[in-house]
Amino acid sequence: MKIIKLDENNIPDIARIEHECFVHPWSEQSIMNAIRAGHTFFGCEKDSVLYGFAGVNIVCGECYVDNVAVSEKYRGSGIGKALMTELISYCKMKNADFVTLEVRCSNKSAIALYESLGFECTGIRPKFYSSPTEDAKIFKLITNK
């Protein structure tokens, strides 16, 4: 498997994984709008099949992780860590001060991944998610050390 930078040609595959992983997935149009607005997406692929992706938006030296998703069959195989590692390297290359993201409080595996990469919980967003309603943990990684 390899990590690649995604573009508009990958939108159907990104949308497929969005629909596999999220109750409220981004539409193909939303993904296209994000790419055209300058958001950067990385994917993990093998034999031209996309197994996961991570998206980030950088504004004024701040990186906001849009989404990280891995097809259910491939979770726990290191794809999420590889994607996040690439995303963090990209943010550092862009001289970002930090990377931030939100995650459902119940998503223990994602929380463990983010903590293993050096992210720290900086707060809670009450009732941030719906279906079901749930708080989000806010994580931040300082990248300008």
Regions found by a protein language model. Name each.
Residues 2-73, 84-86, 90, 94, ...:
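Acetyl-CoA-dependent GNAT
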Residues 65, 99-103:
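Conserved hydrophobic beta-strand within the GNAT/NAT acetyltransferase core sheet
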Residues 71-77, 105-106:
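Active-site acidic-Proline motif in GNAT/NAT acetyltransferases
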Residues 84, 107-110, 127-132:
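Short glycine/proline-centered loop/turn elements that form peptide/ligand docking sites
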Residues 102, 115, 120-135:
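Conserved catalytic-core motifs of GNAT/GCN5-like acyltransferases
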Residues 135-145:
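Terminal substrate-recognition subdomain of acyl/acetyltransferases
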